Amino acid sequence: MASRRRASPRKKPQQRRSRAMVEVLVEATTRVLLKDGYEACTTNRVAEVAGVSIGSVYQYFPDKESLVLAVMERHQEQLQAAMVVRLSELANADLATAVHEMLGAMLEAQRLQPRLHRVLLEQVPRIGALRRLHELNGQYAPLVEAWLETHRDQLGITNPSVAAWVLIGAVEGVLARVLMEKPGWLELGLLQEHLTRLVLSYLQPNVRRSKR
């Protein structure tokens, strides 16, 4: 079986006009995905919604997979921007408060465009972007690792890097299933409470060991 080609833009926009065109195309792709779904998201349809020629689309994106990848990257950047701000505000908070608020920020970010997030999760394997998604999600790791490092003595964590990956994987796994199967739960404070208990149950045994 032939290996799946990784979707990617045809070229990176350098000038302001080019960047503006790419933004128009990415926004049009988002609208098509949300309104019509992945199957109907063709380069011709994107050009129509964007109000540009098909040639303008192909100037920057060779196919619909690369367009969807660009949507995914922008969506992840928006989620991460929200997390960076919240984590910086929690640098000196106590453990329970920081975990609770950090998870609240993650849920709030997921609520920005849950339908889009769900569509992207469904189609990532089809566009050969699973590795890229892992790369983008991996950008959370240094943020969480830095926060764990500040609480290292309190938690008794010997390897904040590993701990960060375990925590991110656990929470992202839950959120992915919620988005796919129970999207209404994103609005429930109860989900935040359960995730807080999940994370603290992983971290608190380290606290007990450090006090022996």
What is the predicted role of each segment?
Residues H117-E122, L130, T150-L198, S210-R212:
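Hydrophobic/aromatic-rich alpha-helical bundle segments in the mid-to-C-terminal region
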Residues E77-M83, T97-H100, G104, E108-L112, ...:
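Amphipathic alpha-helical packing segments from all-alpha helical-bundle domains
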Residues V24, A28, V32-S66, A70:
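Helix-turn-helix
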Residues V85-E89, L120-I127:
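Short linear capping/connector segments at secondary-structure termini
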Residues M1-A20, N206-R212:
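N-terminal intrinsically disordered/low-complexity leader segments
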Residues V22, T43, E65, L69, ...:
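Short, structured helix-loop boundary elements
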Residues L25-L33, L79, M106, V144, ...:
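Short hydrophobic clusters on alpha-helical segments that form packing/core surfaces
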